[in-house]
Amino acid sequence: MKAGLDGGVSQHYIPLGMESQTQAARGRPREFDPEKALAAALNVFWRRGYEGASMAELTEAMGITKPSLYACFGNKESLFRKALDLYERDKLCYIKTALEAPTAKGVAERILRGSLAIQTGTTDPHGCLGVISTVACTAQAESIRDEVIARRASSDAALAARFERARAEGDFPESIDPQALVTYLSAIMQGMAVQAGAGTPREKLEQLVETTLTVWPGK
């Protein structure tokens, strides 16, 4: 990154007020941390959903101006995609670890408990960003809904492959369809996300997890 007019802009920060040389010349530009700004945007999207989050709410939470948002992150859709990347990296990392469990039931347990922890935590909004943003999407935000669905499909494919392996290893009966098991698990998780977002107590959702594991086929 080029140095600012005062010759000392850190490479870790993006200056505000650089929309024109005239503005910059009037005083030292303000600075913001893109990672912190993106985390703030994620929080807004998580609470409000894609369409429910207004540009005014986003810029206020991020502590930046609208021109600076566009310059750093692109439009609202582009910002949401970046927030979704951050969400998957920081909040859904438990899924990759879950796939390494020695049994299919162990995979399901890690996923369900990881999902419950994220959806009912004390520091983040309740519910699931993907579910919130697809359920509430209108036709105008179809590309966002398609993006979230495509990402979920990729995750489901990895889970289906793990369950295929589990069936081949005799982890559960041959009559069980791995893809149907993925659909079942996804339905439980999405239902849990909707209930968490609506304020259902964590204890109730823990009962749902326990019941799901009790009726889980196989070992």
Feature map (PLM): residue ranges:
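Hydrophobic alpha-helical connector segments
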Residues: 82, 95-126, 178-185
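Helix-turn-helix
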Residues: 36, 40, 44-78, 82
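Small-residue (primarily alanine) positions within well-ordered alpha-helices
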Residues: 40-41, 166, 182
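Short, basic, alpha-helical segments at the C-terminal edge of helix-turn-helix-like DNA-binding modules
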Residues: 85-91
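Hydrophobic alpha-helical segments that form the core
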Residues: 2, 126-132, 174-195, 207-215
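C-terminal peripheral helix-coil segments that are non-catalytic and often amphipathic
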Residues: 1-24, 110-118, 153-157, 161-169, ...
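Arg/Lys-rich, glycine/proline-spaced intrinsically disordered segments
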Residues: 27-29
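Amphipathic alpha-helical segments used for helix-helix packing
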Residues: 107-108, 122-146
